[in-house]
Amino acid sequence: DRNETITMAMESTTKIMTCILVLENAKVDETVSVSAYAATMPKVKLYVKCGEHYTVRELLFSLMLESHNDTAVVLGEYIGGKLLGETGEISEHTGEESKAALHRFAQAMNEKAEEIGCEDTWFITPNGLDATETLTLSDGSTLEREHHTTAKDLAEILRYCMKTSPQRDLFLEITGTQDYSFTENGRFFQCHNHNAFLPVSYT
């Protein structure tokens, strides 16, 4: 189908890749702190606050059931920081440090996309909010890239998450959960599954 290779904005389907990368790079019982930058994300969000702590599991349910933009950034920043060799609290990040960690996470997203066979996909953010970036090529020229994918590549990503990834069972457990609630930082949170973008036929 010709439409399979037309580029399109990813929006919330970005969070599928964010989820699987987090599962492959962290344990769900690890505790993550919130940076000032992550707390500024627009709706839809969990309303995390700078300095709060959550488990990776809690954040993943928030991410995949409610598609929260702030939790995507908390998780992306955490994994990006780990990949950069950071050992300190994410909550202590300056704005520039947050962006550097998120840039490293986006690199990991693009590396994974290439690894699983995506042909026309480019990640810039962990939450799918529209973004562009300017890349400097080896010859000194520049290239404008947008956050995008195709239907064909998205199918490859879903297939990997549900069938091939070593963390597929956890991915399916999270995305197949209808309701999840938790209490952290003196607040009660309830997440309901709105995941229309995960077709049953892939499971």
Label each residue range with its predicted role:
Residues 25, 39-47, 70-88, 95:
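Substrate-binding clefts and substrate-entry loops adjacent to catalytic sites
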